[in-house]
């Protein structure tokens, strides 16, 4: 069984924030795959269900982002799970909008939700990094992630959420490559940092080969004496 965790902050005022893309992803998964009603358990909101024969639990910690690890640890203890059974979906400012990356282990890169999970269960869990882009300067990061997605983001955001939902059965079976492929089928290439679909550049036209050839000089049939006489004319 897998515990799939989406990170965010509870409450309507935070629902549309970039920081809450993990919550959004879990809501889409639960709706698309017929998971059970959300129930408040283990300091979070929890929904149980199956992807085929594979059982999974979806968890949205209600502890606020900075204490997400408390809820994750409580759910792990109840279901008797190991860190290797946990997959965390979270916002990632170091990825362009619309980019999705799967990884296992590693640092928290300053993400407070991951920092809390590290402190409670260690780093050996899987993550799905959901790119939201970077505001350009580190001082602007808090205001950026704690702000609603722009209207211009809605198209790529919907593609990402659909793609993650399409790939969710492969999260349950730890098939990272198949998960990534499912996402890629939904998410088309985008211009870095804009969240807009990029247009393929037309191939550069092939250089035309010159068809004209240089004229060959005619052979000089004069004798040496004739050439000498020509010089003194």
UniProtKB/Swiss-Prot annotation:
Subunit organization: Monomer.
Region spans: Disordered: 187-233
Catalytic activity: an N-acyl-L-alpha-aminoacyl-tRNA + H2O = an N-acyl-L-amino acid + a tRNA + H(+)
HAMAP family: Pept_tRNA_hydro_bact (MF_00083)
GO molecular function, one term: peptidyl-tRNA hydrolase activity
GO biological process: one example: rescue of stalled ribosome
Protein name: Peptidyl-tRNA hydrolase
Cited function: Hydrolyzes ribosome-free peptidyl-tRNAs (with 1 or more amino acids incorporated), which drop off the ribosome during protein synthesis, or as a result of ribosome stalling.
CDD domains reported in the protein's UniProt record: PTH
Organism of this sequence: Roseobacter denitrificans (strain ATCC 33942 / OCh 114) (Erythrobacter sp. (strain OCh 114))
GO CC terms, sorted: cytoplasm
EC number, as in UniProt: 3.1.1.29
Site (Discriminates between blocked and unblocked aminoacyl-tRNA): 9
Record's subcellular location: Cytoplasm
Similarity comment: family membership: Belongs to the PTH family.
Binding site for tRNA: 14, 64, 66, 112
Top-level lineage group: Bacteria
InterPro entries per UniProt: Pept_tRNA_hydro (IPR001328), Pept_tRNA_hydro_CS (IPR018171), Pept_tRNA_hydro_sf (IPR036416)
Keyword tags: Cytoplasm, Hydrolase, RNA-binding, tRNA-binding
